[in-house]
């Protein structure tokens, strides 16, 4: 109603209008106040909107009518004004009620919203009643003004009554306060009395404790005195016992000397008889242990500083036994783990009980090993990994065909092996012994570095002292146990013992040892000479009788397994054969009963005896050999191994009627070895052998470590720390023997437990012998290449020599040398050629014996062979650290040979050393690249099994057999030589120095080699297809090749020559070859410059003092990279022969237009980010920029690999338009990522170097009230409200609203409310209403308590301030920059000045700890920040083709890993103030924005993957694949990626594909519908919220962000100029849920390549391009006829050939068949 109409109204009409408006208001108010939340929320929302609008409109009308009142109200003016104010208040109350109702609809279950709504509704009802009453009073007083006097009198009486009531209340409160004060004083007095009593009690207790301690000290002193007396007595007894033992040893030595004299006499007689009876000699195998003085010293018999041995014999024996126990336990564990793995991977359920036995043995050995460990955590970790291996092995046997369990088994075994390697390292560092592992084929050098061995050169043996000392310790121990036998022995018994071979019954074991032992022959002491007195004094008595005729060395296993051999006469072959068979049966029977474990040398000796018996029975004899010896094996290491064979002395045979001299028996099983009868050599041969004695006894070398690691992990995974390479030589032997000889020769290398079966290593007729390594005896001798043993043993058998003092002994020794070599050759020829299960399918030739790198664990995922991208083990042989390792090896060799160089090298600076290493590394890299390129160029030729090329990851310098460097390294790298100088060890351990440079060169070489696989195509199909076409078609194509110009001059000058006549045109085959080469060259240039650009950007971001030259260099390289990208795209179009009028060319045109704009935009600073980089947020922005730069560098590298794969797929299928579309999409993503990288680098450089924005900008204040001192602010109400916990009846009191000073005061005061929860909420949300600087200022103000306050209040307040600071530092240390930390330190000094030393110490220690953690993380991020190793998949398939072949479940796992990695990085401050929606605050939420951007990219990528497919069947296949991926994502509770897929499937270009939807299977549709119902957005994702979300969980982030948005918009930041802290409480609940998901969720899926690399970056077409593709795939029904004639399925230029009499389908099919045939050829 207008003003004129209102002015014409009378009083009655006016009041009637007011009454009508009031009725409408009451109706609408009832509607709003009585909202039923149980109904549908959508209808409630509509009803609320309508009623709220009507309510506000009617209230405004009422206010308008009151303001424009037409009647005269001069007598009651104040009533009119009062009526007007009441209506205004009512309007505000109604607005609050409407907001509360809206919040109630959104969250009806929240206690805060319901209570707030009820409160607002009550106030609205009260206000409407007051309004109606005011209106009625106004009407009454208008008609009767005299009533207002009565009202005034009533008002005066009411005011007086109120004043009296207030006075009474104040008096009552005052009395109550006094009572409370009295009670408090009484309580304080009681507390003081109690404290005094407690102090007295404590003093009494302390006195009692002191008396008890004094008594204990006295008792301990008495016990120590008694122990010292007992030890002195024990020492005296031991000294007496040692004297007695020495006397006994002297007696025994005298007896032995007498026996030697008798033996010498007998030998002289035997030599005379031997000349008469040479036809039938009987050779007695020698039994003495020959050593020389030089070998004793070089072999380590003399004690060293780092040796486990010591002059005290008892301690030495104990340490040797402990080392032996550890060695046996380690060997048993490795072999039994091999058996478990073999049985599990084979899937044989019948062998399941064997897993139990092997597991039992492993558990026993783990217990033994754990006793020797200093770090007990290693033992517990080993036990845990072992239990997991057994559990997974059982699952693998049950599920034979499931690849997943086999992969899990390999992962568990890898963890177990890694722990074993750490245990070996720890024990090695404690015991200082390196021989404890060599006897089992494991070398200490193989655990920490790569072996450098030249197979053509021999390495001089050098052993540590532990082995030789163990030999002598066991000799003395066995000698002391058999003293009685020696005292009773005589010459007759000595003679008879030679002819009676038997197994000794003295086979006993010590309780702490395992049954892998073979005690030494006691008679070895006969062969030592008196010259050994220079060794240790405690061992001199046992070495007085040892003779040293020649320099020979012997090595043994853990307890030096050697056997005493004896022979029988030729007249009794039957008896000897019976004894041999009986002994063999006894040994096998005991081995089956688990009583003993037969050493390998015993088995070999029994096998040799059986072979020789069969040869005697068949009448075969050796033509030249007159003596035999026990087969000698060697102890081996992974890098260097020495093979030592001792001299053999022969004794002429006795007459048949005489007895042979006897040898004393030992405590281990021994066997008799019959030898064939051979004639002796001539004197000339003896002289020649004498002259060549030194050459024939050069130390031999074999390498078993490589083969040992093979049979430990013979299927897939190498043991970490061991090399997996093997070596072999050509097989020159074809003779075979019977099964008995075969079973004996191929025995186990270490039969340490009954649960381990011996792996048999044999040779196959189609393969070479898999040998240990060459046994090089001499450089010019031809026998050194034939003397290579096909064995896998790591034990050592000793050829024992008997010494004679006559001149004939030397001749016999020389004869034995040649005979040993010939016998080894014969034994090699007798090994049967059976296939080997443990060896590789292709053996390498000796000329190509290379150090192949360890391969990653590979397995099949779907139909593509992939690999786990495991963390690289920190060893020098890592691919990334190749240059660094090689350079330091070179420097180490120089420093070891030239001490002066090492001294000067130590004095140099670290920068100088790094430059030297970098220069050497570049030289090695250049040579490596040259060799790798030459090898890759020749890789197309077929290689035979004997000719295997060098892997590209190996060093050509270290692998070259003819290289002098390789020879030098291998000759120096023996068992006693450490290739790393002590001065360089620190550098050697810091292996990540130049990993960034090598990572760049590595990926460049990978991409270059991959592009080199593009094969040149043969004759073009167009020569056949274009015979019937006109010349305009060729001219059109040549136009397109020349850049689209249609003039004839450019066509005639083109390199694509025209060949034709009579109007028929074509082009030469050379054109297609040139196109292929141009595509490869442009792609190679692009990738090289792209990777170089990434490296430059990353280096520039690390350097703080950035120069302008580097920036200009980056921009120039950026421009050149985009130019090469454009050239590569044009080359791919030319190679694919794309029609210029095709829609594909429009995509290329868009990218060409996009490149110049990006060139101008790249490398620009963001003004918003620069202005935000003030004192408050500078350190946060720089930290986020570092993370963003690293992420973008990785993205560019991944996109480069994807583009490489796409280019290769285009070369394989040029007709495939989908590959071209993928290339264009990847190129656009590459450009955008590269521009973002340049912008980030430029922003960091500018913010880091510009001093104007660092410290000069003042911190802005948020409110003027904050400047008031916290102690000077007037008292304001700070009420605490009750908030209930969700889903329970519990709750707590929290402050509703207050000023900043009052909120901080509530944090630091003593009250009954929940301070811990309040503190958590405050720390999570305080940056939404203040900043860290202001909070620090207020806390310092709170600490400065005024002097007027009581001392108790002062102390408690200061304590709570420091306690809150401690909590703040522990939880939110990222809030502190360097300047704020400086204020903290100043506050700490203030604490010291105030005598709060305890608080200062606590605060200072926490600050130091957090600063150390921050500096350590910065060092890791700068020095050790590396990019993950990327994998280029095999084959010539595009990423889309690979995606179709990959397994859906594995794709879901990798997507979950990628998305959860981003989600776990979200910080609480990123979820405040809606910073992700505001441009000025986006720098605060980098991870939230990254997750939003990835979800958007992922949705477009899903749509692109479907629309890139030309055939509708392929589109249906991709669609169903995404549905299956969504199903697996739902099972993993990955709702974020799940909804991203549904967003991509519900875009407009996809929803219009009706034909595609019609072909979906019913199963796929049911899954799609169920998941769509779950993720429906109706009711604010009601279905999604109702689902139980148990960890692991990846929630849908947009739901969380929408909840935060409603909380921010629906609740004001301040209420009556007070901070609304209840709003922060609501926000804290959401943030706490996010933190709970981050902490409780752990997706322990392995990173699998190439899936992970392909899914890291998701290039897609633009929305307009997608819609254009959608129209092409399924045109509109109205334009269907036109679309079929103009748009072809292949978009190839042959599709427009209908005018040239070429059919569309025929031409396209012919082209496709041609390319397929050319690829197959």
UniProtKB/Swiss-Prot annotation:
Tell me the first and last residues of the signal peptide.
Answer: none
Q: Where is the N-terminal Ras-GEF domain?
A: 1291-1411
Coiled-coil spans are 148-279, 802-831
The terms describing its cellular component in GO are: plasma membrane
UniProt-listed PROSITE patterns? RASGEF_CAT (PS50009), RASGEF_NTER (PS50212)
Identify the residues that the record assigns to the Ras-GEF domain, covering every copy: 1447-1676
Q: List all Polar residues biased stretches.
A: 618-627, 968-978
Function statement: Promotes the exchange of Ras-bound GDP by GTP. May also play a role in the activation of rasG.
The protein's name in its UniProt record: Ras guanine nucleotide exchange factor R
Which species is this record about? Dictyostelium discoideum (Social amoeba)
**Gene designation per UniProt:** gefR
């Amino acid at each position: 109603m207008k003003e004129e109409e209102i002015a014409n109204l009378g009083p009655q009409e006016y009041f009637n209008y007011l009454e009508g408006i009031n009725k409408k208001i009451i109706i609408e108010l009832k509607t709003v106040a009585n909202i039923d939340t149980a109904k549908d929320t959508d209808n409630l929302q509509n009803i609320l909107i309508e009623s709220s609008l009507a309510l506000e409109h009617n209230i405004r009308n009422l206010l308008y009518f009151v303001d424009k009142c037409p009647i005269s109200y001069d007598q009651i003016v104040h009533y009119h004004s009062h009526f007007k104010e009441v209506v205004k208040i009512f309007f505000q109350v109604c607005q609050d009620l409407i907001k509360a109702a809206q919040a109630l609809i959104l969250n009806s279950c929240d206690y805060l919203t319901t209570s707030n709504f009820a409160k607002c509704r009550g106030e609205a009802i009260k206000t409407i009643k007051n309004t109606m009453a005011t209106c009625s009073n106004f009407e009454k007083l208008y008609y009767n003004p005299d009533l207002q006097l009565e009202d005034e009198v009533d008002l005066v009486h009411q005011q007086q009554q109120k004043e009296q009531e207030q006075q009474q209340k104040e008096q009552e409160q005052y009395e109550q306060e006094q009572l409370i004060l009295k009670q408090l004083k009484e309580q304080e007095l009681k507390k003081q009395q109690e404290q005094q009593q407690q102090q007295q009690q404590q003093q009494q207790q302390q006195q009692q404790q002191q008396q008890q301690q004094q008594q204990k000290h006295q008792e301990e002193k008495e016990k120590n005195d008694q122990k010292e007396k007992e030890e002195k007595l024990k020492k005296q007894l031991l000294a007496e016992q040692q004297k007695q033992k020495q006397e006994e040893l002297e007696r025994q030595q005298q007896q032995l000397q007498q026996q030697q004299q008798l033996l010498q006499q007998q030998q002289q007689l035997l030599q005379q008889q031997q000349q008469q009876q040479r036809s039938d000699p009987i050779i007695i195998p020698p039994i003495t242990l020959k050593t020389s003085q030089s070998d004793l010293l070089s072999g380590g018999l003399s004690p060293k500083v780092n040796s486990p041995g010591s002059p005290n014999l008892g301690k030495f024996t104990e340490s040797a036994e402990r080392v032996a126990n550890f060695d046996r336990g380690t060997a048993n564990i490795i072999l039994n783990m091999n058996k478990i793995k073999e049985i599990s991977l084979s899937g044989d359920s019948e062998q399941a009980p064997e897993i139990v036995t092997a597991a039992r043995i492993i558990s026993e050995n783990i217990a033994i090993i754990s006793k020797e460990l200093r770090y007990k955590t290693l033992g517990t970790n080993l036990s845990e990994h072992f239990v997991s291996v057994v559990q997974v092995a059982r699952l693998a046997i049950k599920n034979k065909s499931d690849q997943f369990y086999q992969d899990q088994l390999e992962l568990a075994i890898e963890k177990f092996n890694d722990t074993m390697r750490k245990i070996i390292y720890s024990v090695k560092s404690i015991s200082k012994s390196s021989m404890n592992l060599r006897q089992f084929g494991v070398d200490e050098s193989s655990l920490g570095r790569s072996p450098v061995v030249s197979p053509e050169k021999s390495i001089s043996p050098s052993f540590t002292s532990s082995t030789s000392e163990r030999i002598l310790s066991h000799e003395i121990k066995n000698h002391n146990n058999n003293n009685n036998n020696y005292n009773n022995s005589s010459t007759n018994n000595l003679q008879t013992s030679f002819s009676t071979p038997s197994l000794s019954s003295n086979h006993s074991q010590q309780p702490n040892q395992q049954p892998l032992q073979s005690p030494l022959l006691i008679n070895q002491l006969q062969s030592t000479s008196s010259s050994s007195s220079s060794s240790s004094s405690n061992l001199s008595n046992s070495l007085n009788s040892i003779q040293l005729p020649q320099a020979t060395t012997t090595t043994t296993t853990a307890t030096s397994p050697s056997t005493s051999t004896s022979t029988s006469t030729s007249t009794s072959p039957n008896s000897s054969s019976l004894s041999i068979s009986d002994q063999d049966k006894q040994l096998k029977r005991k081995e089956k009963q688990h009583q003993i474990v037969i050493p390998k040398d015993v088995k070999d000796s029994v096998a040799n005896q059986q072979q020789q018996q069969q040869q005697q029975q068949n009448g075969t004899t050796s033509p030249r050999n007159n003596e035999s010896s026990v087969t000698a094996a060697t102890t081996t290491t992974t890098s260097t191994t020495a093979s030592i064979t001792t001299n053999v002395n022969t004794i002429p045979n006795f007459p048949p009627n005489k007895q042979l001299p006897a040898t004393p028996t030992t405590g281990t099983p021994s066997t008799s070895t019959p030898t064939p009868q051979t004639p002796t050599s001539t004197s000339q041969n003896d002289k020649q052998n004498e002259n060549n004695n030194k050459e024939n006894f050069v130390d031999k070398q074999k390498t078993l470590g490589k083969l040992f690691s093979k049979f430990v992990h013979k299927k897939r995974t190498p043991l970490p720390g061991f090399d997996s390479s093997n070596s072999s030589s050509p097989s020159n032997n074809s003779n075979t023997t019977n099964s008995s000889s075969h079973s004996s020769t191929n025995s186990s290398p270490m039969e340490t437990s009954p649960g381990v079966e011996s792996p048999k290593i044999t040779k196959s007729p189609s393969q070479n012998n898999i040998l240990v390594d060459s046994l090089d005896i001499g450089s010019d001798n031809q026998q050194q290449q034939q003397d290579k043993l096909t064995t896998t043993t790591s034990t050592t058998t000793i050829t024992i020599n008997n010494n004679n003092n006559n001149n004939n002994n030397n001749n016999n020794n020389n004869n034995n040398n040649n005979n040993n070599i010939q016998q080894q050759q014969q034994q090699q020829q007798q090994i049967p050629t059976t296939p080997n299960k443990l060896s590789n399918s292709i053996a390498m030739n000796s000329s190509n014996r290379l150090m192949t790198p360890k391969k990653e664990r590979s397995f099949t995922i779907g139909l593509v062979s992939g690999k786990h991208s495991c963390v690289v083990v920190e060893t020098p042989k890592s691919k990334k650290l190749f240059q660094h390792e090689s350079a330091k090896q070179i420097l180490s060799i120089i420093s070891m040979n030239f001490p002066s160089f090492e001294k000067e090298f130590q004095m140099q600076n670290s920068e100088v050393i790094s430059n030297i290493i970098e220069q050497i590394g570049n030289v090695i890299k250049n040579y490596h690249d040259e060799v790798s390129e030459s090898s890759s160029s020749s890789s197309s030729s077929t290689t035979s099994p004997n000719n295997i090329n060098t892997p590209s990851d190996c060093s050509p310098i270290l692998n070259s057999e003819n290289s002098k460097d390789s020879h030098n390294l291998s000759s120096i790298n023996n068992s006693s030589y450490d290739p790393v100088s002590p001065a360089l060890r620190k550098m050697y351990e810091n292996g990540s120095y130049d990993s960034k440079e090598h990572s760049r060169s590595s990926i460049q070489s990978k991409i270059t080699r991959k592009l080199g696989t593009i094969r040149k195509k043969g004759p073009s199909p167009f020569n056949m297809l274009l015979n019937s076409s006109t010349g305009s078609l060729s001219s059109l194509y040549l136009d397109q090749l020349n850049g689209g110009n249609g003039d004839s001059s450019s066509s005639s000058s083109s390199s694509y020559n025209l060949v034709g006549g009579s109007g028929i045109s074509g082009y030469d085959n050379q054109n297609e070859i040139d196109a292929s080469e141009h595509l490869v060259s442009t792609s190679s240039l692009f990738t090289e410059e792209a990777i170089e650009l990434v490296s430059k950007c990353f280096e520039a971001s690390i350097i703080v003092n950035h120069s302008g030259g580097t920036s200009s260099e980056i921009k120039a390289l950026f421009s050149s990279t985009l130019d090469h990208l454009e050239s590569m795209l044009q080359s791919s179009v030319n190679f694919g022969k794309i029609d210029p009028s095709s829609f594909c060319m429009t995509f290329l045109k868009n990218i060409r237009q996009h490149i110049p704009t990006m060139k101008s935009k790249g490398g620009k600073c963001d003004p918003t980010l620069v202005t935000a980089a003030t004192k408050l947020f500078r350190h946060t922005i720089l930290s986020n920029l570092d993370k963003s730069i690293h992420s973008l560098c990785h993205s560019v590298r991944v996109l480069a690999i994807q583009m490489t794969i796409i280019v290769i797929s285009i070369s394989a299928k040029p007709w495939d338009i989908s590959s071209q579309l993928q290339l264009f999409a990847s190129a656009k993503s590459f450009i955008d990522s590269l521009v973002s990288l340049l912008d980030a680098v430029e922003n960091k450089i500018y913010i880091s170097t510009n001093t104007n924005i660092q410290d000069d900008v003042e911190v802005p204040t948020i409110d003027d009230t904050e400047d008031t001192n916290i102690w000077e602010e007037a008292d304001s109400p700070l009420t605490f409200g009750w908030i209930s916990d969700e889903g329970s009846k519990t709750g707590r009191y929290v402050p509703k609203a207050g000023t900043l000073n009052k909120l901080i005061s509530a944090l630091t005061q003593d009250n009954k409310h929940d301070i811990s929860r309040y503190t958590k909420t405050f720390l999570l949300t305080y940056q939404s209403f203040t900043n860290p600087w202001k909070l620090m200022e207020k806390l310092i103000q709170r600490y400065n308590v005024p002097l007027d306050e009581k001392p108790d209040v002062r102390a408690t307040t200061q304590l709570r301030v420091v306690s809150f600071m401690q909590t703040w530092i522990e939880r939110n240390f990222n809030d502190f920059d360097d300047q704020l930390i400086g204020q903290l330190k100043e506050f700490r000094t203030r604490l010291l000045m105030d005598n709060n030393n305890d608080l200062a110490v606590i605060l200072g220690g926490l600050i130091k700890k957090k600063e150390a953690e921050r500096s350590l993380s910065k060092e890791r991020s700068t020095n050790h920040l590396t990019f993950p190793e990327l994998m280029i998949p095999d084959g010539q398939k595009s990423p889309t083709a690979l995606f179709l072949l990959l397994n859906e479940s594995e794709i879901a796992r990798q997507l979950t890993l990628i998305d959860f990695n981003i989600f776990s990085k979200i910080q609480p401050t990123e979820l405040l103030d809606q910073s992700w929606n505001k441009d000025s605050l986006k720098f605060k939420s980098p991870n939230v924005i990254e997750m939003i951007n990835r979800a958007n990219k992922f949705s477009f990528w899903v749509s692109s993957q479907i629309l890139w497919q030309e055939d509708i069947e392929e589109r249906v296949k991709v669609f169903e694949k995404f549905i299956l991926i969504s199903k697996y994502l739902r099972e993993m509770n990955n709702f974020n990626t799940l909804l991203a897929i549904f967003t991509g499937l519900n875009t407009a270009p996809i929803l219009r594909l009706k034909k595609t939807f019609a072909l979906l299977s019913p199963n796929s549709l049911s899954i799609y519908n169920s998941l769509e119902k779950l993720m429906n957005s109706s009711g604010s994702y009601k279905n999604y919220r109702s689902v139980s979300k148990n960890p692991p969980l990846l929630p849908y982030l947009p739901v969380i962000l929408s909840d935060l948005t409603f909380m921010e918009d629906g609740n004001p930041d301040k209420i009556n100029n007070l901070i609304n802290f209840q709003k922060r409480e609501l926000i804290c609940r959401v943030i706490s849920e996010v933190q709970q998901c981050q902490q409780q969720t752990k997706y322990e899926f392995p990173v699998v390549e190439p899936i992970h690399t392909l899914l890291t970056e998701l290039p897609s077409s633009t929305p307009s391009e997608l819609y254009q593709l959608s129209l092409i795939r399924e045109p509109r029904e109205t334009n269907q006829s036109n679309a079929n004639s103009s748009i072809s399925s292949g978009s190839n230029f042959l599709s427009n050939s209908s005018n040239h009499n070429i059919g569309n389908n025929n031409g396209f099919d012919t082209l496709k068949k041609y390319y397929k045939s050319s690829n197959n050829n």
